[in-house]
Design a protein with these regions (language model features):
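ATP-dependent phospho-/nucleotidyl transfer catalytic cores
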Residues: 398
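Accessory carbohydrate-recognition regions in carbohydrate-active enzymes
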Residues: 1-330, 336-393, 401-427, 433-436, ...
Length: 682
């Protein structure tokens, strides 16, 4: 359902009272907006095609939404229900009386076209709507079929088509639709395969089966009903992106229209994903729970490289100028280290190295912005390069990932080079202030240090948030901060420091600032990604019980199953995936290590279904709101003192038993051999 006007990134607002269309959307974010969009809208009474005027009022008590089906009864008595497949959908629509029964199909202008085919009793068209990241020949080709005779049809000047029916009051009109980015012929093939001749009930039942299988791979037991609703709502959101952009030809082979070179290729393509967000927890979740999806995504990343010269960092559907870093390298490395090795390792290494040594001329976020300065100075200088300190920290982590991959695939010379570059984070630690800060190209520290200043050398945050972005070497960060105890004290202070801010170069209070202030958790800003791993860093400095306390506190305070269930941007599933992992009791602080750092499990029992029929069971005896601390742990009956689990330990299956308590065990997980990976101690 679309409540916003065409072109608005806010396509469905819970506070809105009008629906303007039922939209085939590909939108991954309101900031990125949509592409390849068309909508289908019942209109009753007077014919109105314009999206600004055709909306019909509804109330939420007459609306029901589930992963497999959506239903609404409008205030004028029209009912609409729909269920979707991968590339199509089925609608059932009824009208309260016989006069003025219309369907409007909107191709969103932007050079789109629509027409009515009388012989086929269908509307077909092409929508070319986009907000960037597409070749010149881009189009989404669609077909909309009706099971009742059309008595009138027409089009308007705004790429809308309409049809009128004359049905009995309450009689069901069934609409079948499908689309293709390849051609109308492929759209027809998609329609015949996925929805042709199928009822709403058929499609809904199949959708429910698929969602049950996907979400059923993690079974939680116990906890409150609200906690279970929140958990599975987060899992649902995590599974929405990235989007399958491939189709199947007549031979049932995967093919796709490339949003990079505009040609049709064999193989897999995924899109609608910002790796700056999703490398942290979404893709690590796929490697563990949905490895077959992760395999195809890695192939897709390299397909994009072959077709454009760069791996994607933010794709929708092609390269978009958004965010920073080289986190495509993280995805490939993490997958490889976890045994997902169906992609070309030599091509992957070639693509990784190229990603660090070039930058797209058109889009600064594609490739490595400031790579020449980074290589010559050991950091990206500010103000010469926007967001330079954040980029330096991101590049250092990406270089570590590249080194890990090169080492694992037998390229020691490359590994040695990039392991050295992975230490560049040290070059922007301002020891006099104890925070990450900015240097110019002459090596001078930026004046007027302010750890609460947003923007400038940082991305959507301040030094309080970005100082922790040393995923691959918390031990090295600890040495910069002075000791394990001093790093733990700095983490403590993050939660109690005044939640003041300086909006800096942003010039106004961006929503991430407002969200941090509203959370009232000091300088901890869970509503945005850079700091979401920071709680788990207590495990690296011998105070794991604090990670257990704070992770539970964040889950309980900042998430719920309602319309306002997130404390900030959900961002392609990342904020949801944080909750999924954290509710299980562990989190992938550093993708590429194959380690999951412990927190506090939320449920008494969780069963994870794994490949080859294996299961990994997490038993948290005595867990409750008060009992958030780990007293003791056993892995397959053997005492377990480490602050992390290994990926291979999970994949083998088994049982992880935890005895939970209301008071912390300050003797568990305090020895350095129990700490997770850091490059400085490898």
């Amino acid at each position: 359902p679309q409540t916003g006007e065409n072109g608005s990134g806010w396509m469905y607002m819970y506070t809105d009272s009008l629906i303007r269309g039922f939209r085939q959307t590909h939108q991954p974010s309101p900031w990125i907006n949509d592409y390849g969009t068309f909508s289908i809208m019942p209109v009753f009474g007077k014919l109105v095609t314009d999206n600004k005027s055709r909306g019909m009022s509804f109330r939420h008590e007459n609306e029901k939404a589930a992963p497999d089906c959506y239903r609404v009864r409008f205030d004028n008595g029209v009912t609409t229900a729909l269920s979707a497949t991968s590339r199509g959908a089925v609608f059932e629509i009824t009208y309260p009386s016989e006069e003025g029964q219309y369907i409007v199909v909107d191709a969103y202008q932007h050079g789109g076209s629509v027409a009515f085919d009388k012989e086929q009793n269908c509307i077909y068209g092409t929508t070319r709507y986009n907000n960037g990241g597409v070749p010149e020949n881009f189009g989404n080709h669609f077909i909309v079929e009706f099971d009742k005779p059309v008595v009138e049809a027409g089009t308007d000047e705004n790429s809308c088509a309409y049809v009128r029916f004359r049905l009995n009051a309450g009689e069901t009109l069934t609409v079948h639709t499908a689309s293709s980015f390849i051609s109308h012929e492929q759209a027809r093939l998609n329609l015949s395969r996925e929805v042709d001749g199928r009822s709403l009930a058929d499609v809904s039942a199949e959708a429910k089966r698929i969602w049950d299988e996907q979400m059923g791979r993690i079974k939680v037991e116990g906890g409150t009903e609200e906690q279970q609703k929140t958990f599975y709502s987060c899992l649902y959101r995590t599974l929405l992106f990235p989007r399958e952009f491939y189709e199947f030809n007549e031979q049932e082979e995967p093919v796709y229209y490339s949003p990079y070179d505009g040609l049709v290729h064999n193989g897999y393509m995924y899109t609608d994903n910002g790796f700056w967000d999703t490398f942290r927890a979404v893709h690590p979740l796929f490697t563990l729970i949905y490895p077959e999806v992760s395999e195809r995504i890695m192939q897709s990343v390299l397909n994009a490289y072959n077709e454009s010269g760069f791996m994607p960092e933010w794709a929708s559907p092609g390269h978009r100028g958004c965010m920073i870093g080289n986190n495509s390298i993280s995805l490939l490395t993490d997958a490889w280290m976890k045994g997902i090795r169906t992609f070309d390792k030599d091509k992957a290494l070639e693509a990784m190295v190229h990603q660090t040594q070039a930058r797209s001329e058109e889009i600064s976020s594609v490739g490595r912005d400031g790579y020449a300065e980074y290589d010559s100075l050991g950091y990206v200088p500010y103000p010469e390069v926007h967001e330079a300190t954040a980029k330096t920290l991101e590049y250092a982590y990406a270089d570590w990932c590249l080194a890990r991959f090169a080492e694992a695939t037998g390229h020691k010379d490359v590994a040695d080079t990039y392991y050295q570059k992975a230490q560049n984070y040290r070059n922007l630690f301002y020891s006099e202030k104890g925070f990450m800060w900015a240097n110019d190209s002459d090596g001078k520290w930026r004046e007027n240090f302010d750890a609460t200043e947003w923007g400038g050398p940082f991305t959507e945050g301040c030094s309080w948030h970005w100082t922790w972005s040393v995923f691959h070497d918390p031990e090295g960060l600890s040495s910069l901060l002075g000791s394990h105890k001093l790093m733990a004290a700095r983490l403590d202070s993050m939660f109690v420091a005044p939640n003041t801010y300086n909006y800096g170069t942003y010039g106004f209070v961006i929503h991430e600032i407002a969200e941090m202030v509203a959370l009232d958790m000091g300088q901890y800003a869970h509503g945005n990604q850079p700091i979401q791993h920071a709680i788990y860093l207590y495990n690296y400095v011998g105070e794991p019980w604090k990670a257990q306390y704070h992770t539970r506190n964040v889950m309980n305070r900042l998430y719920n199953s309602g319309p306002e269930g997130y404390c900030g941007d959900e961002d392609n599933g990342q904020t949801s995936a944080w909750y999924i992992f954290t509710a299980l009791g562990f989190y992938p602080v550093c993708p590429g290590t194959s380690e999951y750092v412990l927190g506090s499990p939320l449920f008494p029992k969780v069963t994870i279904s794994l490949p080859e029929g294996k299961t990994f069971v997490i038993d948290a005896e005595g867990v409750s709101d008060n009992n958030c601390y780990i007293r003791t742990a056993e892995l397959n009956g053997v005492d377990f003192t480490r602050n992390y689990l290994k990926h291979d330990e999970l994949l083998k299956g088994g049982e992880f038993r935890l005895l939970m308590d209301s008071v912390p065990n300050m003797e568990r997980g305090i020895n350095t051999e129990d700490f997770p990976y850091s490059y400085s101690t490898k």
